[in-house]
Swiss-Prot record:
Keyword Lyase assigned: yes
Keywords: Lyase
GO biological process: cyanate metabolic process
UniProt xrefs under SUPFAM superfamilies: Cyanase C-terminal domain, lambda repressor-like DNA-binding domains
Gene3D superfamilies recorded: Cyanate lyase, C-terminal domain, lambda repressor-like DNA-binding domains
Record Pfam families: Cyanate_lyase (PF02560), CYNS_N (PF21291)
Function: Catalyzes the reaction of cyanate with bicarbonate to produce ammonia and carbon dioxide.
Top EC class for this record: lyase
Catalysis: reaction(s): cyanate + hydrogencarbonate + 3 H(+) = NH4(+) + 2 CO2
The protein's name: Cyanate hydratase
Length: 147
């Protein structure tokens, strides 16, 4: 058994029972974005959170322990994503990455945007021409230091 097996069980149970990520997040008491990432194997749950997730998805005590193991983050099955939605993000970074970098450096100086001290919010934005996906990424700016 490994973390991928637990993720597959969570997804299978989610589909079979019609569970939503938002309902899981409410029971865990955290954002739907973070909890979804955790259920998909990209974040580490603490013991209390793992028990809540375990109860929702019918996980054994051993399976709940796997939710508490630090995962190998950013583990997509291929270097260039093939899923169309994920590929759009790859494309966005390919096209706009240098622009984002330049504008962040112009505003903040030389450094990076943290993906650790980070939050994300995904909401539906109604639009008469077709609903839009509104994604807000908020990461702490971390300046490079001289030494």
């Amino acid at each position: 058994m490994n973390r991928n097996d637990i993720t597959e069980k969570i997804i299978t149970t989610k589909v079979a029972k019609g569970i939503t990520w938002e309902s899981v997040a409410k029971k865990v008491g955290l954002s739907k974005e973070w909890v979804t990432a955790g259920c998909l194997g990209q974040m580490t749950f603490d013991e209390k959170q793992a028990k809540v997730v375990g109860k929702i998805f019918g996980l054994t005590a051993e399976e709940q322990k796997w939710l508490q193991v630090v995962p190998y983050k950013g583990s997509l099955p291929t270097p260039v994503p093939t899923d169309p939605l994920i590929y759009r993000w790859y494309e966005i970074v390919s096209v706009y990455g240098t622009t984002i970098k330049e504008l962040i450096h112009e505003e903040f100086g030389d450094g990076i945007m943290s993906a650790i001290d980070f939050s994300m919010d995904i909401v539906r934005q109604p639009d008469p021409k077709g609903d839009r996906v509104n994604v807000v990424l908020s990461g702490k700016f971390l300046p490079y230091k001289t030494y």
